[in-house]
């Protein structure tokens, strides 16, 4: 459960991401593909090379979903319901992959926002991404 302080940290940090959200989303995906090569199996039709348009577009989708979640932090299950259905029923993404992407997102944010990425903000973002992952995997059951 996100505390009021967690919610403030997440909103403030994501606000700093701003117009770079798509770029950071793509960078996190690239990190995930390089660090955890098995995640590539969900993207057999993608050009996964550095800077590919497909990775950039999907990175923007990831960032847009996170922006939606930040904006609806008190009602993520409703806000992310369609995305949860998609990942559970159509794409059938193994839930562990959300944890891997979350880790890569944290690394990316820490690299780009070192001054803002305090231990408290790190913990809040980690809890937020875990909450998003829980929502996205809730319809697997």
UniProtKB/Swiss-Prot annotation:
Residue ranges constituting the Globin domain according to the UniProt record: 1-141
Residues the record lists as Phosphothreonine modifications: 108, 134, 137
* KW Transport (keyword) present: yes
Pfam families, sorted: Globin (PF00042)
Q: Which InterPro entries match?
A: Globin, Globin-like_sf, Globin/Proto, Hemoglobin_a-typ, Hemoglobin_oxygen_transport, Hemoglobin_pi
Positions annotated to bind heme b: 87
Where on the chain is N6-acetyllysine found, per UniProt?
16
CDD domains for this protein: Hb-alpha-like (cd08927)
Q: What does this protein do?
A: Involved in oxygen transport from the lung to the various peripheral tissues.
The protein here is known as Hemoglobin subunit alpha
